[in-house]
């Protein structure tokens, strides 16, 4: 069904602190827990999943650029860059790879500055507020769209 698809999972700043950073907002799972679970799901779907996390905007942009011609779909939790990064937006537009924006928390139930995303209007879809399960939904949605 999904043979040979390559999906890139990108996680932005401070997500390396998951499990200990504001667990009442982001949950108790670590980023490694989420990635391991998603990798197992990807394997079951016969999809190659590559993961990269960085606290540096330029490193995420470089990964997006390198994905051009090599990746079929991007799943991205841009974290705080959601609300600030025109550069990340331009990189995603530049490579023309479909992507799904993911947020662990419901950004619309939080501070007003979190209500704006520079990425949502160019994303295939946005998943927020469903915790780590949102990553699974995004993976399945990407595979469905590619199949």
Swiss-Prot record:
The record marks 21 as: Transition state stabilizer. It catalyses: 3-dehydroquinate = 3-dehydroshikimate + H2O. It comes from the Bacteria. GO terms for molecular function: 3-dehydroquinate dehydratase activity. The keyword Transcription does not apply. Homododecamer. Belongs to the type-II 3-dehydroquinase family. This is 3-dehydroquinate dehydratase. It comes from Proteus mirabilis (strain HI4320). The gene is aroQ.
């Amino acid at each position: 069904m999904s043979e040979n698809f390559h999906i890139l999972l990108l996680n932005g700043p401070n997500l390396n602190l998951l499990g200990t950073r504001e667990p009442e907002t982001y949950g108790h799972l670590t980023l490694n827990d989420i990635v391991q679970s998603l990798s197992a799901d990807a394997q079951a779907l016969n999809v190659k999943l590559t993961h990269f996390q960085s606290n540096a905007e330029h490193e995420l942009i470089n990964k997006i650029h390198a994905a051009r011609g090599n990746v079929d779909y991007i799943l991205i939790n841009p974290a705080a860059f959601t609300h600030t990064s025109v550069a990340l937006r331009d990189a995603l537009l530049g490579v023309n790879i479909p992507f799904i924006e993911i947020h662990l928390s419901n950004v619309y139930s939080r501070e007003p500055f979190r209500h704006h995303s520079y990425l949502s209007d160019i994303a295939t879809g946005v998943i927020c507020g469903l915790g780590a399960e949102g990553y699974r939904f995004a993976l399945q949605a990407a595979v469905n769209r590619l199949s």
